[in-house]
Amino acid sequence: MSTINLPLNLTVRVHPVVLFQIVDAYERRNADSERVIGTLLGSVEKGIVEVTNCFCVPHKEHADQVEAELGYASDLYDLNRRVNPSENIVGWWATGQEVTNHSSVIHEYYARECNNPIHLTLDTSLTAARMGIKAYVCVSLGVPGGKTGCMFTPINVEVTSYEPEVVGLSLCAKTIGVQSNPARPRTVSPMLDLAQVSEASGKLQTLLGEVLNYVEDVLAEKQQPDNFVGRALLDLIHSVPNMKHEEFAKMFNSNVKDLLMVVTLSQLIKTQLQLNEKLTSLTSFLS
């Protein structure tokens, strides 16, 4: 067993796309497969393991051994490196609630692929009220000159996301309750641009109202001031450009014109593609 010296104060940050990929792999598993495993891709920096991608590795588990298609895993990783050279192997994942007897064997392989791999488990069986996410590191155990082994020790794990992922998650959240309410549509289409601007403006107005209420309560000594909140508000004010109303209106109108130009060009391209498709079909029919 490979010796792994890893601090236990690590934090694993998993992006939503990784969780979706794991669930998708679990839904597509073979009928005789009890669980699914795969490779975690991402980066490690200053005690933070950020998992941004993953892929499934076909395998079979027997009573005394594990058979995994390691050649497939290596080829898929090489292909991913061509597209995302910044993503490296940081560990492996498995569906299920707990670590199994075969986990140490699989972890030994990933210990040869990267330094200090992590192990992520996702409870796709939904035994609890929520889909449980756990992360582990393998700590070597034993006495000098005697038998050695390893133990999977839990570490902190949290879900993080980029701004585009937040938009996608917000859209997915609107479909919650579709299964329990058959009258609701099963799909939700993205809103129009102006509708998104209107919704974002409404949320911004609500947040500004909460900030104003907080500031007024602090000034009226109804609430204790918070230095952290004060510094955050000061940074927010300094980040807003100081410009006149006419300059802002000119800049806004310029951006709107650019947006309308992009929309017009997109519609022209769409029309051209549709016309080309019809002409191609007509030519094939005449010939």
Swiss-Prot record:
Signal peptide: none annotated. InterPro entries: eIF3f (IPR027531), EIF3F/CSN6-like_C (IPR024969), JAMM/MPN+_dom (IPR000555), MPN (IPR037518). Component of the eukaryotic translation initiation factor 3 (eIF-3) complex, which is involved in protein synthesis of a specialized repertoire of mRNAs and, together with other initiation factors, stimulates binding of mRNA and methionyl-tRNAi to the 40S ribosome. The eIF-3 complex specifically targets and initiates translation of a subset of mRNAs involved in cell proliferation. Component of the eukaryotic translation initiation factor 3 (eIF-3) complex. GO terms for biological process: formation of cytoplasmic translation initiation complex. The keyword Cytoplasm applies. It comes from Culex quinquefasciatus (Southern house mosquito). Keywords: Cytoplasm, Initiation factor, Protein biosynthesis. Residues 12-142 form the MPN domain. One of its GO terms (cellular component) is eukaryotic 43S preinitiation complex. It holds the Pfam family JAB. It is found in: Cytoplasm. This is Eukaryotic translation initiation factor 3 subunit F. The gene is eIF3-S5. The lineage of its organism: Eukaryota, Metazoa, Ecdysozoa, Arthropoda, Hexapoda.
